[in-house]
A protein has these predicted regions:
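Mixed-charge (Asp/Glu-Lys/Arg
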Residues: 1-132
């Protein structure tokens, strides 16, 4: 979570539990239009493959929940909705996992607001921003 703060995000909050609706972590950034844009992060340990297992379906369901279920932002004291969902994993996205997740979300605008971070990308960002 310190990485998100170093990237300039604010209101970083850990939400893991049964009422997180696909958002293990939430945070925001102020846009160029002086409005807040909210992000949700679904965190998974290990690799995610495009094989016939429950990981893909679970991630699709959680991403849909993250977009559709508002959350209470304790900082603004308002119910808000996520604009972007980040799927962050400690391992790698293997085979066709990313494609299956994107295609599993039917709504076109939502597909364009998914961000995939694997362990290598996370390490690279941490290394780059740990200097600041």
């Amino acid at each position: 979570m310190p990485l998100f703060r170093k990237l300039g995000f604010v209101n970083v909050k850990y939400n893991h539990g049964n009422k997180e609706f696909g958002k293990d972590v939430t945070f925001a950034r102020r846009t160029e239009f002086d409005e807040y844009e909210y992000y949700g992060v679904q965190v998974k340990f290990g690799d995610v493959s495009g094989g016939a297992n429950g990981d893909i379906n679970e991630l699709i369901t959680q991403a849909k929940d993250a977009f559709s279920m508002p959350f209470y932002d304790v900082y603004s004291r308002n119910k808000v909705r996520i604009s972007k969902v980040i799927i962050a994993i400690s391992g790698k996205f293997t085979l066709n996992a990313v494609e299956k997740i994107i295609e599993g979300i039917q709504e076109y605008p939502l597909k364009n607001n998914l961000i995939f971070l694997d362990g290598e990308k996370i390490e690279s960002l941490m290394s780059k921003y740990s200097r600041f």
